[in-house]
From Swiss-Prot:
Subunit structure: The complex is composed of two ATP-binding proteins (LolD) and two transmembrane proteins (LolC and LolE).
Sites where the protein binds ATP: G42, S43, S44, G45, S46, G47, K48, S49
GO cellular component: plasma membrane
Protein name, entry field: Lipoprotein-releasing system ATP-binding protein LolD
Signal peptide: none
The keyword Nucleotide-binding appears for this protein: yes
Subcellular location field: Cell inner membrane
Sorted UniProt keywords: ATP-binding, Cell inner membrane, Cell membrane, Membrane, Nucleotide-binding, Translocase, Transport
Superkingdom of origin organism: Bacteria
Species of provenance: Rickettsia bellii (strain RML369-C)
Amino acid sequence: MSNKILTLKNVSKHYRQGNSIIRVLDDLNLNINEGELIAIIGSSGSGKSTLLHIAGLLDKPTNGEVIIANNEYKTNHLIRLNYLGFIYQQHHLLKDFTAIENVIMPRLINGSNQKEAIEAAKSILDSLGLGKKLHNMPGELSGGEQQRVAIARSLINKPKIILADEPTGNLDPKTTNEVFNLFLKVAKEQNTAIVMVTHNHELAHRMDKLYKLKHGALNMS
């Protein structure tokens, strides 16, 4: 039996521009089950990032509900820490902190002691092939290594779902495949669902479900 972990129910997002209303998302519905891999494609400006921000409680819908773990939430910092992880095209690592220091931060914020957080970070960085780069600064890492650190940081609290916005968009094709393979491997080991926005159709077709966002609506592709 599937275990639904995130639902967008009749979600709309509208912006007013002068006397006009721009309908970015229009009565959109999406159900995400535990461990499910979902890709969303669409043209630039179609609302893909807006959709992720609403799903991740970083933005509010004009209408509709965001339901996480069977509860409706408008915005909640603790829910984001416990249930959601985020990965972006830019790694957003703190340049003055080492790889492992960047990774342990969400764990410490979530209440873990430093020893436990370090052990968890070592384990996940090692699984991503960075066991020998724990104490490197971001500037000492390649682009692919930086993004793997960002992936480790997003997974450190074992979230139920990862929201990924073009997670390999800045990487060359070879590095893209290497990073994406490791990302899927660790997510599957943790039974973490992924919702990924991407322009890379090859990666999109490797997911369980593929949706296209067009005219504010999601359609199975």
